[in-house]
Amino acid sequence: MAKTRFIQSSFVSGELSPLLKGRIDINQYYQAVETAENVVIVPQGGMRRRPGTEFITECVKGISKKSPTYTMPNGGTSSVLNDGDDTTSTSTTTPIGTTDPYVVAKMDLLVDLPMKFIDLRQISLSTGTSSQFKVQYSTDDVTYADAASVPLLGTNPQNFRLLVDHTARYWRLARIGATDLGAATVTIAGLSLYEESAILSTPRLVDMSVEDDRHYLVEFTRDNIAIFRSQLVGINIQTTRVADIKPLYSGLTSAEIENIRVAQVENVMLIVGDFAPMRLVNLGTDSDWFLDLIPFTNVPQYDFDDALSPIPVDEIQVMTLGHTGSGQWKRGDRFEIDVEGVLSKSISFAGDSTPDEQASTVFNIQKNLQEMPVFGETGVAVTRTGTKQYTITISGESTKDFELFSAYVTEGSTDHEIDFTKTQSGSPRKEDVWSSTRGYPNSICFYEGRLVIGGTESKTQSIFMSKTGSFFDFDIDDGDDDEAIFATISSRKLNDIVDVYPGRNLQIFTSGAEFAVTSKPTTPSSITIQPQTSHGANKVEVQDVDGSTIFVDRHGKSLLSFLYSFNEDAYTSDDRSVLASHLINQPVDMALLAGTASDDANWLFIVNTDGTATILNTLRSQDINGFTSWKTDGDVKSVCVVDDQLFMTVERTVNSVKKLFIERWDFTYLMDCSIKSVQVAGVIDGLDHLDGESVKVLTRDGQADANEGYVLSSYTVASGEITLDPSEVYSFTTYEVGLPFVPTIKPMPLNTNIGSGQNQMRLKKIVRMNLRVYESSGIHIDGIAVPVREFGEAGTTSPLTGGSIIPKTGIIEDVYDINGWGREVIPTITCPDPTPMHIQMIEYEVEGN
């Protein structure tokens, strides 16, 4: 029997589609695998265990406002506290002084109920400041405990949403403390309690960076906006909930939440979606935020001319041609009309004596007015209503409430006068392009000092750009270079805008094609929107990856790279996922982790509609482009990168109940949804999120090497904690507790040359196999544990002894007789326990038939 050797030292092409099993003619076949599950590609060529995830928090479900009985023992009108109207407020009448407790308002729910939030609306002090106000709860109206502290109050009204998360019947807002506040009283417009409902909606995660060391994760849910700060504390990343905000929308569905888009400049985030556009501002500290509607001015107008359009009212102005001296109007005299700063062409007076002269003068006035850019294509009518008197009626698409017209003579006697009077003010049929009637913007970004809005619900193919340097002003009247722009894509097919991206040009992704604004600079008179490619994109927000813009095609089946080509002098779109198309399944979200402090890879995390995830490892300069799959005990729903930390939301079934968690990708975690904690008297708590679930336990970061990296027994969480077996209790040791996952690598079917040709489809046998590994332990081949021969001084450890499970770098040597004879005898490499795994190279000795 002929024997050959085959070495695979690169895995940078990742997992290949089953459709490529026969493509032994391409280089990618020999640097790829058939299965790459729960692993990631290392840019240097190997594959390693994917990161685990740290549990951050459970996502907020829907919330509903309660209607307790209110009392205000220190004066005030309690009926306004839950009316939902921030414009009506009430004030206490008793001075605060040194009263402790000073109860502003008390709420009685009649029975004990679990409350999630309390809203304080437009609360202020009449004088002074205080940080001693608390929200408290009680089950008996006698003994109260703190549920939340109110941030510093002053004389300016403020809004707060506080997380209370307690079950009680009685709740109160009170000053707790003895600081003398003198004659100060409290004014408040709203005090509302909210209970969490069972409505589960996928949140939208976005990042917001205010300074180099201040990075926030913003979570949008159906009734809440939660803000978390991610920061390095010591050697660990710490993610802390710092604020909750009542949004200016309510009751969003999962689909509506998914459509949220944001753009950020300095400490301001602009938010658009299926609601009135909002502005979120950080005021300097983690807990100090302000949310309001974006203060747009001069919103672009459009005449939709349908059943929803306003009924227009005609504008009527009367023009009279007169004179002050002896100079009479003569045929051939000329004049121009000024309409709100815009001049008409020169109008010729044709006389006013005969019917023909009168008709000709009327025609000249009407024609030149209609051609003015301030009017539409139709709607200007002129009639002669007296001697040298002409009534101008503006109707239909042209009407609005105009300023009084004016005019001046360009040719004729200096005695001529032209007077105007307004007899009726008009109102237009045109209306704001975005509004509660017409819907709101779909996408948003900044480009060349302008705010760009890509499509609205009613103008899906239009681009709107603000005035230069004035992001909220969309004044387009004069068409000056710095004024706003309103442009519409015109092509042979429907091109609804789904995203806009500010690259080397403004890139516009639509449902039918990809476009770019190629004019430099972009002005109202020069804007050019040119088609580039015609794939079409779905609604997933595009990502800038390694110098190209990655988007998902409109069918949700491929990942495309939008990249400028100097040879074409245009953008081209290449299919990045053609070799792993089976891993792209209607993506709903994606985010780029562009290298970290410990890794130089670019990982694009793609969330599929079926709850699986796909990771693209890419480094264009090194021709690295490989996909691996991510599977967990649950469904991944959304993803976001904050600075160099990747967060995801995962829907898990815990004790038969569906829950949504925010989790953080971290290579120092070896399990999913896990926590790191210490044991106290053999008990590890903080596991409420996994109550009723079976979890694995791993020792981590022990002060003695003997306590590091042991995989302990499985336990079932009860009442948010587990009790360790006495034999598994270690002092000075951190434990990781979470849900296990299994990394799996299965190489492509072997193809070697045995002299008579390629043998991929022939019977063969792997008689020996060696693996080079890095910092690994607990590796199994076809379900059988194999030892690592560690590099080091001779005789320090036996290569055949399990011994310590501290990760080792070395060779798994002389694995014999893999799977017997067959055509596809490739082994499966796994790591069933939560231990490190990093494969660098595989060597086969193959015997062929």
PLM region descriptions:
Residues 426-433, 717-758, 831-847:
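Surface-exposed interaction regions enriched in Ser/Thr/Asp/Glu
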Residues 383-428:
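Acidic, small/polar residue-enriched beta-strand/turn segments
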Residues 1-70, 79, 85, 197-240, ...:
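N-terminal beta-propeller domains
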Residues 174-182, 829-833:
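Short beta-strand-plus-loop segments that form exposed binding edges in beta-rich domains
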Residues 101-106, 110-148, 156-165, 170-171, ...:
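Extended, beta-strand-rich, solvent-exposed assembly scaffolds of outer structural proteins
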Residues 42, 54-55, 59-110, 124-128, ...:
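Disordered, acidic Ser/Thr/Pro-rich linker "stalks" and the adjacent N-terminal cap
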Residues 247, 253-305:
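Hydrophobic or amphipathic alpha-helical targeting/insertion segments
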Residues 450, 491-696, 701:
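Beta-sheet-dominated scaffold domains
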